[in-house]
Amino acid sequence: MTDFLRDDIRFLGQILGEVIAEQEGQEVYELVEQARLTSFDIAKGNAEMDSLVQVFDGITPAKATPIARAFSHFALLANLAEDLYDEELREQALDAGDTPPDSTLDATWLKLNEGNVGAEAVADVLRNAEVAPVLTAHPTETRRRTVFDAQKWITTHMRERHALQSAEPTARTQSKLDEIEKNIRRRITILWQTALIRVARPRIEDEIEVGLRYYKLSLLEEIPRINRDVAVELRERFGEGVPLKPVVKPGSWIGGDHDGNPYVTAETVEYSTHRAAETVLKYYARQLHSLEHELSLSDRMNKVTPQLLALADAGHNDVPSRVDEPYRRAVHGVRGRILATTAELIGEDAVEGVWFKVFTPYASPEEFLNDALTIDHSLRESKDVLIADDRLSVLISAIESFGFNLYALDLRQNSESYEDVLTELFERAQVTANYRELSEAEKLEVLLKELRSPRPLIPHGSDEYSEVTDRELGIFRTASEAVKKFGPRMVPHCIISMASSVTDVLEPMVLLKEFGLIAANGDNPRGTVDVIPLFETIEDLQAGAGILDELWKIDLYRNYLLQRDNVQEVMLGYSDSNKDGGYFSANWALYDAELQLVELCRSAGVKLRLFHGRGGTVGRGGGPSYDAILAQPRGAVQGSVRITEQGEIISAKYGNPETARRNLEALVSATLEASLLDVSELTDHQRAYDIMSEISELSLKKYASLVHEDQGFIDYFTQSTPLQEIGSLNIGSRPSSRKQTSSVEDLRAIPWVLSWSQSRVMLPGWFGVGTALEQWIGEGEQATQRIAELQTLNESWPFFTSVLDNMAQVMSKAELRLAKLYADLIPDTEVAERVYSVIREEYFLTKKMFCVITGSDDLLDDNPLLARSVQRRYPYLLPLNVIQVEMMRRYRKGDQSEQVSRNIQLTMNGLSTALRNSG
């Protein structure tokens, strides 16, 4: 850790401590300090965990609240300091002229150059390029806008402080530093007096607003900038023949993901689509307003094109002061039309004033883009390239990137629900009496007949359906209306979770047809929505390629795919596959499924786009996105990748413009490299695959013996983690399980992983791997040879390296001594001790095997930056966990007061902040 980072953390921590003493009193401050220092002693091995338990012995809920808040704020400020440090390191490397680091576009251009990648290969990859970060809701990402604003201001002031500290001192340096410190103290005081979390359970609308906040914080500016920069670089390096469509195309699930969430309705789809459109249209209006002020160029000084003059004449801005300023008059007219468009699409209440009413709304984003390009062309013709390359170029890129929709809203529902809806519709329409009970072949016959027929399935004016069916129909109806209003890019994807058959994929197509998103035309349907199977369980992942092979033999579906650019998108579920089979088995099942899909698509002549349903944690497919994309099989990326982003991961990646740029670059860089370069050095692919398959089977056996076969496991899990509290407190809008059940299978992935993260076991990120590796390696001479094989794979194969690195990262955040405190909450001591012993033994065996294969002495030897980050977080995490255990104990004994409930929620959010990838 550099002096600069250490100084920042101490500086911010000291101010926070002084604010706590001032606001809460000396007693609270001293208890915070005692807990912090005790945590440091535990981290250094100079004290036992019981010493921290004793610090909080008998603590009242009222006194626990400021302590939980204190350590949550410490974590928040430490994150801020680390982000600044990462930013500083990047700037220093650039200033020093160092070789660009991996995951940057500069490094990617060098690699493409060294690999002699030609323009034709680049053009082929970019023709259907799509790098899509898809924002999803998360129960612990409930920070309020006020908190984000405070963080933003503190970050700004810290940058000012750094600039002064690194500059040559002057007579005013100290007074300026004092003023900056005063500003930071003011912001931290405001932060301390602001509630970190909401009182009420967040509504879907709240989660939609949280997602939109990141566009305002960074993505509205940074997505157009990176798309523009990539286009410029590609044109310069590979010529005009390379397609220059926007590469980054954002998406969202918030408001459209109704899988297991009864609160997603037609109203939330409408809210999500309208607020997204309103956000981007108002962004355009602001940019045009600025351009109108900036483009004061006079036609007395330079020439303009006839097209620009025509645009200026249509601008209704003939005031004398602007008679010779055609650009201002042109932009004024364009702004008027965008405001008129906003009024038409969103409502007149969304626009101030009435002056825009003389303008005609734009019929499409393309019409708006043409006007912007008219201005751009005129500037370039008159040699004003520098001016064109500024704000206007970002605006043009924004129009190409966002259209009038901002993001693509995905619809997602599970296959069982679609089947239930169609069963009711078919029965009511007298198509078939009990569709659900038909064989697969019989279902297929019914579905194809319906998809070929233009006849409506729902009689006009009919609304006598069950509540569930009515809700589903409302969602599709509203999605169709949004597409008509904002264009086909608004709702271009329909995802079927738990897809396990051909008919699972065809069923939602009937609903899409019913509401005009697919037009029936015999065996040649037309439509604007990609139908995407989501393979989630180990079994479904293994069967996925076979399902698609059968699907593509159906002329109707194959023709539909052809008119969708011949692209088949497939979503892979990291979360449920992990819950189903454990960390290693899930990772191998996913990789093996991709191998099969790549080969199938190659032989069938279909383009493959993979959508990775990754969570923040390693247990849900998390880890560095750059490494994860490079770890995909050759041919699995092909210029396109979609990835879910959620929770603390969103705030960590996109909370400010600098980190947003860095993370967007990482996604684009990895996509280009994985598509155009061979990043694997494997010499015997089949041997590597056989090894993974054998280890996977052993890992699955160990995992299943605990999670699926141990009779006491469910009790251990539900009673030693905050699962019950996640379900009962106001944490997220979605229920914690798909059904009212206590089985692992029906739990949603986020509560499953979040619960293990909070209790610091992190079980989904490693359990079963140690036993599998030990058993596969064996003993004697065979062991020596097999260890060498695994070491070679670790050095030459990004997939295996990524699996081990991600596992080490999550294991470094586990703390089995804390896990024992959670286990002590279980009434049945026999179950508690037995299951805890199994977990503890497997943890240390897994750590041992990791060190054997990597040649390391510890988990993070090869990642000192992350190791120091984990060490810095340790003192903030321990007090939060100890307080959480005490509050859970009270809650379960019947003290479900608001104070106790709030403390549990505070500690959950604090731990999620400190861990930075908790669920």
From Swiss-Prot:
One of its GO terms (biological process) is carbon fixation. PROSITE patterns: PEPCASE_1, PEPCASE_2. It holds the Pfam family PEPcase. The keyword Oxidoreductase does not apply. GO terms for cellular component: cytosol. Activity not stimulated by acetyl-CoA in the absence of any allosteric inhibitor, while the corresponding protein from E.coli is strongly stimulated. InterPro entries: PEP_COase, PEP_COase_bac/pln-type, PEP_COase_Lys_AS, PEPCASE_His_AS, Pyrv/PenolPyrv_kinase-like_dom. The keyword Acetylation does not apply. The active site is at H138, K579. Its cofactor is Mg(2+). GO terms for molecular function: magnesium ion binding; phosphoenolpyruvate carboxylase activity. Signal peptide: none annotated. Its EC number is 4.1.1.31. It catalyses: oxaloacetate + phosphate = phosphoenolpyruvate + hydrogencarbonate. Keywords: Carbon dioxide fixation, Lyase, Magnesium. Forms oxaloacetate, a four-carbon dicarboxylic acid source for the tricarboxylic acid cycle. Belongs to the PEPCase type 1 family. NCBIfam families: PRK00009.1. This is Phosphoenolpyruvate carboxylase. It comes from Corynebacterium glutamicum (strain ATCC 13032 / DSM 20300 / JCM 1318 / BCRC 11384 / CCUG 27702 / LMG 3730 / NBRC 12168 / NCIMB 10025 / NRRL B-2784 / 534). The lineage of its organism: Bacteria, Bacillati, Actinomycetota, Actinomycetes, Mycobacteriales. The gene is ppc.
